[in-house]
Amino acid sequence: MALERSDVEKIAHLARLGLSEADLPRTTETLNNILGLIDQMQAVDTSGVEPLAHPLEATQRLRPDAVTETDHRDAYQTIAPAVEEGLYLVPKVIES
């Protein structure tokens, strides 16, 4: 599956990316190369291969789940333009 220029323009619009006319050919080629690599990986027969969660058989040493830092939320929120009930208020960017 190869992407056309119009596909890349639509993807850029949906992702809110500003691509210049000069960037479109290079971006289209890069995305097509990525999709080609994905096609190659999907073509490999892995029917006899067990799923692998991690390449190394190692045990993770996890630290205890304990609070190690003090709460600085109030100090950080004093410089925020708008805060309500401990949450930062930001302008709406996605229209419904």
UniProtKB/Swiss-Prot annotation:
UniProt keyword Protein biosynthesis, yes or no: yes
UniProt xrefs under InterPro entries: Asp/Glu-ADT_sf_sub_c (IPR036113), GatC (IPR003837)
UniProt keyword terms in alphabetical order: ATP-binding, Ligase, Nucleotide-binding, Protein biosynthesis
Gene Ontology MF term list: asparaginyl-tRNA synthase (glutamine-hydrolyzing) activity; ATP binding; glutaminyl-tRNA synthase (glutamine-hydrolyzing) activity
TM segment ranges: none
Protein's GO biological process: glutaminyl-tRNAGln biosynthesis via transamidation; regulation of translational fidelity; translation
E.C. number(s) listed in UniProt: 6.3.5.-
Domain of life the protein comes from: Bacteria
Enzymatic reactions: L-glutamyl-tRNA(Gln) + L-glutamine + ATP + H2O = L-glutaminyl-tRNA(Gln) + L-glutamate + ADP + phosphate + H(+); L-aspartyl-tRNA(Asn) + L-glutamine + ATP + H2O = L-asparaginyl-tRNA(Asn) + L-glutamate + ADP + phosphate + 2 H(+)
Signal peptide: none
Enzyme class: ligase
Family under the similarity heading: Belongs to the GatC family.
Quaternary state and interactors: Heterotrimer of A, B and C subunits.
Function of the molecule: Allows the formation of correctly charged Asn-tRNA(Asn) or Gln-tRNA(Gln) through the transamidation of misacylated Asp-tRNA(Asn) or Glu-tRNA(Gln) in organisms which lack either or both of asparaginyl-tRNA or glutaminyl-tRNA synthetases. The reaction takes place in the presence of glutamine and ATP through an activated phospho-Asp-tRNA(Asn) or phospho-Glu-tRNA(Gln).
Annotated protein name in UniProt: Glutamyl-tRNA(Gln) amidotransferase subunit C
Species, as recorded: Pseudomonas aeruginosa (strain ATCC 15692 / DSM 22644 / CIP 104116 / JCM 14847 / LMG 12228 / 1C / PRS 101 / PAO1)
